[in-house]
Structures are given as structure tokens and as C-alpha cells.
Amino acid sequence: DIDVKGKIYFKESDTLSSGNKVTIAKTDFGKVGIGICYDIRFPELAKLMAEAGAQILFYPGAFNMTTGPAHWELTFRSRALDNQVYCVGVAPALNKDASYHSYGHSIIANPWGEVIVQLDEQENMEIAEIDLEEIKKVRTELPLLKNKRSDLYKINLI
């Protein structure tokens, strides 16, 4: 749901319902995590998928013309960098005749947090090669997951 005063009001929860589990799929090349549009905003969900062995996180999504320019690239780069995985956002093209205007800009961010593919708002397609060895390389160079201190991430009330 979104309510940015003077820009956009849209209540997805009136038509969509939330899921109740983390989705990991085994493929011929490895595990992938699958979320949907709004899920990209929750770092904990991406972390759970990465910790379950997902090497690529897929998020089909349709950010709008307010949140898209502000957050689309930033969130995909962040989730990729945080978890040292590939993060793929697949978006519909902008249709100015539709009642909802999607930002478009399908994107792939690599484990270093760099954008390796980003389309514009037009209907388009691009084929990109994803090198899963890059994940191992980045995790060796910057061992974030290895050095994570999960033991400290608990709140003890006193």
C-alpha cells in the first residue's frame, strides 16, 4: 500500500493477499529465491533466501512513477550487495493509457551491488549471462556472510 500525499495513493491489499512462506526453487544451475514486488523492500526476506542457498533472487514487480525513480535501482542493488547474490527485477513497460503507471526498468544487480543490466520504461528484452562463480569470488574478497555475528542480533530485555 502507498499513500504519498499529492502524488499517488494505491492500496494493493484490497486486491492482493500476502504469502505465508519463503519461496526457494531448485533449478539445474542452483537455488533461486522468488519474491514479488513489495518483498524487495524487506532485507530480512532476502537474507533468509540467501541463507537457504539462493544464488539469484527474482522479484517481478511494478513500482509506480513515484517510488520507481526513488527506490527501484537502490533496493535491487542493496539486496544484491547485502547478500552477495544476483538480484533480478522484472517489470512491465510503462503504459500511459493504463490506470496504473509502472516505472518499468527491469534490472539485474550483481553480488558486488553493481547494475549489469537495466532497461528503460519501454517494452524491451535483454538476455544477460549470470556468472555464479562471481558469487564465490565476491564472498571471498569481502566475507560478509562469513563474518556475520548472528549471536549479537538478539534483543535481551532487562
What kind of region is each of these model predictions?
Residues 1-52, 65-74, 141-144:
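Active-site catalytic loop in hydrolytic enzyme cores
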Residues 8, 37, 99-102, 152:
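Intrinsically disordered, low-complexity N-terminal regions enriched in serine/proline/glycine
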Residues 28-29, 111-113, 131-133:
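Short loop segments at secondary-structure junctions
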Residues 41-126:
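CN hydrolase (nitrilase-like) catalytic-core segments centered on the catalytic cysteine
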Residues 121-123, 130-131, 137-138:
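Structured C-terminal cap/extension of enzyme domains
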